[in-house]
A protein has these predicted regions:
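Residue-level signal for inorganic ion chemistry
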Residues: 29, 53, 113, 145, ...
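Short glycine-/small-residue-rich flexible loop motifs, especially phosphate/cofactor-binding loops
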Residues: 37, 94, 195, 271, ...
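A common structural junction motif
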Residues: 42-46, 316-323
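Phosphate/pyrophosphate- and phosphate-bearing ligand-binding catalytic cores of soluble enzymes
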Residues: 4-5, 11-17, 147-306, 322-336
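Anion-binding (especially nucleotide phosphate/pyrophosphate-binding) glycine-rich loop
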Residues: 1-143
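Beta-rich strand-turn-strand
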Residues: 102, 305-308
Length: 336
């Protein structure tokens, strides 16, 4: 078990915010996680459970303990199920699936972060969400040290939400996630510009490797590398609005993109609305909006969490003024 004091979290958040925590603890097994929670009973520190930090905005120093998983492994349990340690890199899991003819995860290629976070955030892209794959989540209860095995339905997944993100927040240390894949390849090509990108390559029926590479190329073209430009990927969730609201806006904006959710709701891309407000490529101090994708906020160098908060709240205000729609961060802010 690794323990550090007055520890910089700069390397533990992709936004590149240099915030410190009072104490940093990394556990590398279920047994160490249980030992850790027993020691926490004797203390009264505020807690932050931290994964890869790819979906986190640190708004200041944290006077508490950061708990970080170092449990990193992958194993195939049976023909369709794969179990990963909570610290196993998400895209390495996707790569494993593709190379072992296990299908379903390929549309989630090169999403940053770790497998444990997939069970918290219900990450998603191109018509697929983690909830479509998650079979079981193993977690240690902080209050008791007991190991629990939660099935998919227990976690109450919805768009970028789960019980781990809400009522179970800071109550469990996720130690592993088991995913159920498919041995039958049924590619999903109709979300975003996947089919158009394949057509440019002269590919009509892509192999899973070709689909993964195409999605990787699409994402790399519009999303900045956090090793070069601090960011947390898509900053805002795409709002889901009533059909009547969509029709009202569609009458004003003929080319407004949208995705039908059901008979009564439509999803409108937040990035499109932000771009319509003139924010694409613009900055507010050392924080800005990426010039290739308006949904991504970036650290232009030396930005604090407060700088990013000021930017995203200004964008929220402008979108609400122009479209009458509230957009909410997908990224978690802490301390909040």
């Amino acid at each position: 078990m690794k323990i550090e004091h007055n520890y910089s979290l700069l390397k533990h958040n992709t936004f590149g915010i240099d915030a410190k925590c009072q104490r940093f603890v990394e556990y590398e097994s279920v047994e160490e996680a249980q030992e850790l929670v027993r020691s926490l009973k004797e203390e009264d520190y505020p807690l932050l459970i931290l994964g890869g930090g790819s979906n986190l905005l640190l708004t200041g120093d944290f006077k508490g303990t950061v708990l970080h998983s170092g449990i990193s492994f992958i194993e195939q349990i049976d023909e369709e199920r794969v179990r990963c340690g909570s610290a196993y890199v998400w895209d390495d899991f996707v790569d494993y699936c593709v190379s072992h003819d296990l299908y379903g995860a390929e549309n989630l290629s090169i999403i940053p972060g770790e497998c444990g976070a997939s069970a918290v955030q219900n990450i998603g892209a191109y018509g697929v969400e983690a909830k479509d794959l998650i079979d079981e989540v193993e977690a240690v209860e902080i209050a008791t040290g007991e190991v629990h095995h939660f099935k998919n339905a227990d976690c109450e997944y919805s768009y970028r939400q789960s019980k781990f993100k809400n009522e179970w927040r800071n109550k469990y240390l996720i130690t592993s996630v088991t995913y159920r894949l498919s041995k039958t390849y049924q590619p999903k090509l109709d979300y975003g510009n996947i089919r158009a990108a394949l057509a440019e390559q002269g590919i009509e029926n892509p192999t899973v490797a070709e689909l993964r590479q195409t999605i990787t190329d699409i994402r790399n073209a519009k999303l900045p590398d956090p090793k070069k430009i601090g960011n947390a990927g898509s900053f805002f969730m795409n709002p889901i609005v009533p059909k009547a609201k969509y029709e009202e806006l569609a009458a004003q904006y003929e080319r407004m993109p949208h995705y039908t959710i059901d008979a009564d709701h439509e999803k409108i891309p937040a990035g499109w609305m932000i771009e319509q407000c003139g924010w694409k490529g613009k900055a507010l101090g050392p924080a800005g909006v990426y010039d290739k994708q308006a949904l991504v906020l970036v650290n232009l160098g030396g930005a604090t969490g407060a700088d990013v908060v000021r930017l995203y709240q200004t964008i929220q205000h402008d979108v609400k003024e122009k479209f009458g729609i509230e957009i909410h961060p997908e990224v978690n802010t802490f301390p909040n």
